[in-house]
Amino acid sequence: MLNIVVVFPKKEIVLKMKNVLIKNGFDVSAVCVTGAQAIQAVERLEAGVVVCGIRFADMIYNELKECIPDTFEMVVIASNAQWQEYGDDDVIYLPLPLKAYDLVDTVSDLLTDIHRRLKRE
C-alpha cells in the first residue's frame, strides 16, 4: 500500500495540508511536526510520499531524506528564499504560495510512479 506522510513544524499547517489531500481523495497515513516523528512513521510503512516543509525543530528536510527508504519520494514546500538557502535538486520542490492543485497533481504523479516501480520489482 502506498502512503502519504505530512511533516511541517506547525500543527496548523500539517492539518491544512492533510485536509487538502483528504478532500482530493488521498489517505494520509501520518501527520508529524518533527523529523523524528516522520522517521518513526515511515519505518512502519512500505512506500509512498513525504510532503514536508524545509525545516523542522530537530532537522532540515535533507537530513530527513537521508533517513527514509528509497521507496519514498519527497515533496518539499517552501518559500523561494528558503529554497535558495537550503534546497537541492534531489527532491521535488513546490514554491509558496502553494496552489492546492499543484500539490494534488504532484502527489498523484509520484504515487503512480512509485506504484509502477514497485510492480516491476
Sequence positions of predicted segments:
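Conserved acidic carboxylate
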Residues: F8
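Conserved phosphotransfer microenvironments
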Residues: G35, G48-P69, S79-Q82
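C-terminal output helix
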Residues: L98-L111, H115, K119
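Acidic, metal-coordinating helix/loop segments flanking the phosphotransfer/catalytic sites
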Residues: V31-V49
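Short, structured coil segments at secondary-structure junctions
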Residues: G25, D70-T71, G87-D89
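Two-component/phosphorelay signaling modules centered on CheY-like receiver
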Residues: K11-A30
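Alpha4 helix (beta4-alpha4-beta5 surface) of REC/receiver domains from two-component response regulators
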Residues: E63, A78-L96, D105
